């Protein structure tokens, strides 16, 4: 049986906590508050959470998928983000960030290299635009793995170049561990970085990270499981 990133981090986590509507903001933000005090964002795929409940939980907004449900992903009721959800978040003063991930593990998007990057970037751009995303807002392309340096050079870097060829360097974000972020920086790939902790030594925040995913699968808002992400820089790819 294969073990996923979420399995590794979930098994390492303490007993899950539950938060919901009406719980004080400190319950959500205090354990994960960023050093700069910029707040936290939620990311989730299993459903759509009303803006009122996100606000009540103490989050500044959401990182939302502009990607389709993959085969067997019928539980991903929150994919892709729809314009009605985006309007609800905007009208309630919450931040929105776009991210893209279709495949996972053996079907990971980045395994297809540059041609896959072009294909997925085109689809991400379509869904981002359909949801009302601004033309200048970035999309985070997911490297939801702990790739080796050889995998980075042969597959991840070409995948990111594919994204940049479609939406441009300034609009390409990278979701990856701190090692992947460092390699991308060395190659001049990506303008925004969202760090996860699978393969990030000690879970330390990379200095270039705009966002840092610090907790997964431990909390629930509005009946939907959420991950917690620290905002590390004032500009983190939010819709303007």
Q: What is the meaning of each model-derived region?
A:
Residues 55, 90, 164, 168:
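Anion (oxyanion) recognition and catalysis
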Residues 146-167:
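Active-site cleft segment of glycoside hydrolase catalytic domains centered on the general acid/base Glu
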Residues 46, 64-148:
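Substrate-binding cleft of extracellular glycoside hydrolase catalytic domains
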Residues 19-37:
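C-terminal region of N-terminal signal peptides and the immediate post-cleavage residues
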Residues 1-19:
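N-terminal secretory signal peptides and thylakoid transit peptides that target proteins
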Residues 36-47, 51-53, 181-240:
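Functionally critical loop-and-helix segments that line ligand-binding/catalytic clefts
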Residues 40-42, 62-64, 96-99, 139, ...:
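Hydrophobic faces of well-ordered beta-strands that scaffold small-molecule active sites
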Residues 169-181:
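Aromatic-lined carbohydrate-recognition surfaces of secreted/lumenal glycan-active proteins
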